[in-house]
Structures are given as C-alpha cells and as structure tokens.
C-alpha cells in the first residue's frame, strides 16, 4: 500500500512512529528556512515539516506547489507548546518529513480552495472534481456515506432484503413528466426512467418478499427548486402484514437511531398531527414546529362586517379568513409591510391586511390600521383576544380561497420566523396523518393527493359516494418544515384499485393498458402492505446544514437540468438517431 494512514487519523498516540501519507498539498509555507506543507486527503489534513538538514528532501519540498499530489514519509511528533491547531483533527501533532515523492504536478486551480465564497456555482460545478477537494464538501459526502451505512445496517438487522428494481420501465402517471428512452429494437416505442420504484415494490410484496428496501435512483423531468434534482436518490421501503402505526414506528426508530449514530442527537417520540390540523394551524402539510407562530381562523367575527374583502370569504365555505400574530411587530415600518405584501402575492394573495396593536386599553384608538374602521369594536376585541394580541404586536390577515390563504400566510409564518429569529429549537420532527384521498380541481375532477395506489379509510362504495371527504391511510414524516419521507398503506384489492382509478378519470380500457400487470397481481393473493420512501438528498442536506441538495450530491445538475462539467445533455449524431428511428424536427425561428 502506498500509505499507512489517512491524515485525519493521526493523533498523539502515534508520537514517534513512522507514517506514510498520500494526498494533495493544501498549503505551502516557508518560515525561517523551514518548509511547512499542509497535506490533505479525504479524512482531513496534517502538517508536515521539512528542515534543511535533509537537503534533497528539503529541495523537493521547495519545488512543491498547491494541489500537487504527493507521497510523504516521516515521523510523528508532538507540536511545540503554543503551536497546537485546535481546528485540525491532527492539530496536536506534526510530521517531520524525510521522504517526499511527487506523484503528479498540478496547474493552478481555477479558484482557490481556501477562498471559495465568491466563486460562482457554475464555475464550481464546471470543475466539480476540484470543488469536491474542499474539506467542507468532502465532509458532506463522508457524512452521506455514514448515513446510508447506518440505514442499511438498521434495515438489515430488521429483516429487510435489498432488492433492485428496473431502471428501464414504462411510463405511468405519477405526477411529473417522465424521462423517456427510445427503444432501438421496438421502433416508435419508449422506455421511461422510474419516478419511483412504487409499482415494482408492491409487486415484490405480492411475490412474498415481505420486507424490502432499496437505495434507489429516481428521475423526474420537472422544474427545479432548491430541493429538487432531475435525478435523485430515495430510501425506498415496503412491508407486508404491518399496519400504518407499525410502519411509522419502525421507520421512526430508524431515523432516531440514525441521528444518534451520526450527529449524537437524541429525539423523543415524534408527535402526530392530522392534515386538517396542520393546515388550520400552520397553513402547511409539513409544518415547522420550531416556529411558535400560528394561524387563527376568525371568519365567524367577520361575516356581517361592512367590508367585502373580509365578509365575502367569511361567508364562503370554500374560503377562510385567518389572522397571524407577530409578537413585538408593531414597530414594523410600512416599507417592511409592503415587502411582506409583495411576498404573499407570490402565493396568490391579493393583499395583506394588518392591525398594529399600540395600546389595547384605548380601544380602537389604540389600534393602527386602515381596516379597523370597518370592523365593530366588539368583534375586534374577540379577534385580538383569540390571537393573544398584546401591546406592541402586529396582526396580519388573509381572506381568500382556502388554498390561497393557507399557502400565503403559511409561507409568511415561515418568513417571519426566520426574519425575527423566533425558532425555539434546532430540530422538530413530527408525523402528519389523515390526508385527504383526493384534491378536487376547479372543474370538479379529482387528483390523487399522494398517488393512485394509496388505500382509503373506507369501502369502495363509500369512496365513490363521497370522494371529496374521503381520508387516506397516508403518513408523512416532517423535519423542520421539510418532508423527509412520505408513505401509505397501499390498495391490495382489485375492486378498490379500480374504484380509485375511476374517480381519477382512468376508465377500464386505460386501466388495462397502463396498469394491467398491477390489476393482474391484485387478483392473485396480494397481501395487505404499505411502505414509505425517504428523500436521501434532502435528509443529508438537513443533517449537514447545507442550503441546497446540490451541495450533498457528488455531481449534481444545475437548475436548468444540465451538467456543465460533461456538457450533458448533448447532441447525438445522425447515425445513432436513425438506429433509434428518430428524426429531429427543425426548430421554428421566432422573428
């Protein structure tokens, strides 16, 4: 072996021993005739000292520059008093180098590895192989490896089998666009890359593999955000003969064990909250419970006011009128209120009403707002009491369709929590349960809230009679306002699956064409089953404190779904296209 130790493994217990290191020169310094090299590898850094007594080695060290690849042999020794570096794992020792081999030279990198904050992300992604040398990036990928190892260990110990499912499959409606792969041998036909292993893992349950897991690559051709990539990794889990409480208990234990092993954090039992309560109190089905702010419904106090902005929604069962109190916010300048008004407009809100509570004892005179003249004082007092308003607070209001108000004030709640540093703790895991089966569209049609294979909490007859109010056996694990994982008990009876398809507008012929294999499987003794899938990239992002999942993926795509390093996607030559029976249409020029 070319090395005896990694740099990050060196400590005082090795004092006096000979070691051989391999890595990159992170920094070179010349102090008073002595050369110091900081050597970096994936596990950390170590300081190597070369003195002029060994002329040949000293001369070699003098020629070395940053990012040269080197092999160094030397003796471990404790650093002198006052020279200990507490910021380095090996900071209590140094290596007295007496042999240095340059394994490869390096050109000057396109950006310094010590000063990266002002380097654009595109440059970092173009030279990702250099960007990943930075200790901050290496730390994230090492922690990602520890996370997957911990999860595999837990699932292996609990009787789960790691089974791979196909990457080349067929398109099924799962909510996003598919990535399509043309078939050379079947002219005009296409494979689809899987958005998830959903149907295959259900078929594994039918086949009798009652505890399955896979760390699976998934693909979705959708618009990208901070927590989205066209290809992403999923911790996919499915079980038979367990109900939702047992699946939730098992996967909660896995996450609690993971945080203890990797971050030395202990979580208590995760609280449970229904979807209805989460939307009512927080305006989100993935609430951040670190934030103490809550939405409070006040429609009952505004039904009869002479102010249509409030009275209209207050009397419409499809709308809501909601208040959000910000403690100590009465001193907020108008410019900041205007900024928040613009912010909620992103979510469809047509304005942001507010009341500043300056001195409640003075009644209406102690309130500052353009809307107080439209609301009777008795109603104002009920509203202020209900939200817990005291002097110095500001209360914001939303009045519109239920979805608009929930999303707008829910997002404002998160924004205020961060802007005013209101978060009460570092971690807040929870479960959200009792999701609706369907979302009703403007035209009265239905969309599956999770996916079409989620089991409802009712019979097929009850489901078809009252689809708008049906609840599902779905559950989401949420951490700090981020959905870590989502799952459900699946439909295991053919009649129920067909009923759900019908409600989604998928008639018998289309059912057979797209899902015939699943319906066949449900006829042959499908067991009760359910599961859950975690987004590995999001989980690592949270555990490392990264701002984007691009920071925790070795070679991510940009927000335009491109790889600037390999220049993918790229053009394909005409011969390859002919073999795939594809002819490109000329782009119409826009004048």
Curated annotation (Swiss-Prot):
The keyword Protein biosynthesis applies. InterPro entries: Aa-tRNA-synt_II, aa-tRNA-synth_II, aa-tRNA-synth_II/BPL/LPL, Asp-tRNA-ligase_1, Asp-tRNA-ligase_1_N, Asp/Asn-tRNA-synth_IIb, AspRS_core, GAD-like_sf. It comes from the Bacteria. One of its GO terms (biological process) is aspartyl-tRNA aminoacylation. It catalyses: tRNA(Asx) + L-aspartate + ATP = L-aspartyl-tRNA(Asx) + AMP + diphosphate. Homodimer. This is Aspartate--tRNA(Asp/Asn) ligase. It comes from Pseudomonas putida (strain W619). The gene is aspS.
């Amino acid at each position: 072996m070319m090395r005896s130790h990694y740099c990050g493994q060196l400590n005082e217990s090795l004092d006096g021993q000979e070691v051989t290191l391999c890595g990159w020169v992170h920094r070179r310094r010349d102090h008073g005739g002595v050369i110091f090299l900081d050597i970096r590898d994936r596990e950390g850094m170590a300081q190597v000292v070369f003195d002029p007594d060994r002329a040949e080695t000293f001369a070699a060290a003098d020629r070395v520059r940053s990012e040269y690849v080197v092999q160094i042999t030397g003796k471990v020794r404790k650093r002198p008093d006052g020279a200990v570096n507490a910021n380095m794992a090996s900071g209590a020792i140094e290596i007295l180098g007496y042999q240095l081999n340059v394994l490869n030279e390096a050109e000057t990198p396109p950006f310094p590895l010590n000063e990266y904050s002002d380097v654009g992300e595109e440059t970092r992604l173009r030279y990702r192989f250099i960007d990943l040398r930075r200790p901050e990036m290496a730390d994230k990928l090492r922690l990602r490896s520890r996370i997957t190892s911990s999860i595999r260990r837990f699932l292996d110990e609990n009787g789960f089998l790691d089974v791979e499912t196909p990457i080349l499959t067929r398109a099924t409606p799962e909510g996003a666009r598919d990535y399509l792969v043309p078939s050379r041998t079947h002219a005009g036909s296409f494979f689809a890359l899987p958005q998830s292993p959903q149907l295959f893992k259900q078929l594994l349950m039918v086949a009798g593999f009652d505890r399955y897991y896979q760390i699976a690559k998934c693909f979705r051709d959708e618009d990208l955000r901070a927590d989205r990539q066209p290809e992403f990794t999923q911790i996919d889990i499915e079980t038979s003969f367990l109900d939702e409480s047992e699946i939730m208990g098992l996967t909660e234990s896995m996450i609690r064990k993971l945080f203890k092993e990797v971050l030395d954090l202990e979580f208590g039992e995760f609280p449970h909250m229904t979807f209805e309560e989460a939307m009512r109190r927080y305006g989100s089905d993935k609430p951040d419970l670190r934030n103490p702010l809550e939405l409070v419904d006040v429609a009952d106090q505004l039904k009869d006011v002479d102010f249509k902005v409030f009275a209209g929604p207050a009397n419409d069962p499809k709308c809501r009128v909601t208040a959000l109190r910000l403690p100590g916010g009465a001193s907020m300048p108008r410019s900041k209120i205007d900024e928040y008004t613009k912010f909620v407009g992103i979510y469809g809100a047509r304005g942001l009403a507010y009341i500043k509570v300056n001195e409640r004892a003075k009644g209406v005179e102690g309130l500052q707002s353009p809307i107080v003249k439209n609301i009777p004082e008795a109603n104002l007092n009920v509203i202020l009491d209900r939200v817990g308003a005291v002097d110095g607070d500001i209360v914001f209001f939303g009045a519109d369709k239920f979805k608009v108000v929930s999303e707008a004030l829910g997002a404002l709640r998160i924004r205020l929590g961060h802007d005013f540093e209101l978060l009460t703790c570092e971690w807040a895991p929870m479960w959200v349960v009792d999701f609706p089966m369907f979302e009703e569209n403007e035209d009265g049609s239905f969309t599956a809230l999770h996916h079409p294979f989620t089991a409802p909490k009712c019979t097929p007859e009850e489901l078809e009679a009252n689809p708008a109010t049906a609840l599902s056996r779905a559950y989401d694990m949420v951490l700090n306002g981020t959905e870590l994982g989502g799952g459900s008990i699946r439909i295991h009876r053919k009649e129920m699956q067909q009923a759900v398809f019908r409600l989604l507008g998928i008639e018998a012929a289309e059912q057979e064409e797209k899902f015939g294999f699943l319906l066949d499987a449900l006829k042959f003794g499908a067991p009760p089953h359910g599961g859950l899938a975690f987004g590995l990239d999001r989980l690592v992002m949270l555990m490392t404190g990264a701002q984007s999942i691009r920071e925790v993926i070795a070679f991510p795509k940009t927000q335009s779904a491109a790889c600037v390093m390999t220049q993918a996607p790229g053009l394909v030559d005409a011969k390859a296209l002919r073999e795939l029976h594809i002819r490109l249409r000329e782009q119409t020029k826009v004048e």
